[in-house]
UniProtKB/Swiss-Prot annotation:
GO terms for molecular function: ATP binding; magnesium ion binding; shikimate kinase activity. GO terms for biological process: amino acid biosynthetic process; aromatic amino acid family biosynthetic process; chorismate biosynthetic process. Pfam families: SKI. It is found in: Cytoplasm. This is Shikimate kinase. It comes from Coxiella burnetii (strain RSA 331 / Henzerling II). Belongs to the shikimate kinase family.
Length: 179
């Protein structure tokens, strides 16, 4: 199967390793890594938690949709998406049509460990929620959407970002052209 598209999109729940693997993919391919949440923060001058607080999740998702639309117009990029990017049909369509979609998975315990290590328990969907239960709930809702979009799927529980990035590139080259 050939897919003549040059962007690589990383999808999955928070703590799945999208940014870590994306950073290694960017180094190996000499491409620019974009993180959609960080790009939203740059554009607005506000952090994601503040946007959620002031505009609610709907306001954040609107900003996310605009950012995804802009980033999908670029070529030869690596994009680590926000975990909820799949909730919007337009996002799913644009991402699927403009690149190879890599779904990174991890156990809930691994995700919690990674999120805690990064000091990211302030994430908007964690505030006022039991973290483990919230991740399980998010996974139940989003997993079918991630799976439907995914061209390739990788578990990251025993993550070595460099090795996984190398394997992803090998698999992409074996499966698709022009990447």
């Amino acid at each position: 199967m050939k897919k003549d598209l040059t962007n690589i999109y990383l999808i999955g729940l928070m703590g799945a390793g999208k940014t870590s693997v994306g950073s290694q993919l960017a180094k190996l391919t000499k491409r620019i890594l974009y993180d959609s949440d960080k790009e939203i923060e740059k554009r607005t001058g506000a952090d994601i938690a503040w946007i959620f607080e002031m505009e609610g999740e709907a306001g954040f998702r609107r900003r996310e949709r605009e950012m995804i639309e802009a980033l999908c117009k670029l070529d030869n990029i690596i994009l680590a998406t926000g975990g909820g990017v799949v909730l919007d049909e337009k996002n799913r369509q644009q991402i699927s049509e403009t690149g190879v979609v890599i779904y990174l998975t991890a156990s809930i315990d691994t995700q919690l460990k990674r999120i805690g290590q990064k000091g990211e328990m302030r994430r908007p969907l964690f505030i006022k929620n039991n973290s483990k239960e919230k991740l399980q709930q998010l996974n139940e809702i989003r997993k079918p959407l991630y799976q439907a979009m995914a061209d390739l799927v990788y578990p990251t529980d025993d993550l070595n970002p460099r090795q996984l990035a190398t394997q992803i590139l090998v698999d992409i080259k074996q499966t698709y052209s022009d990447l």
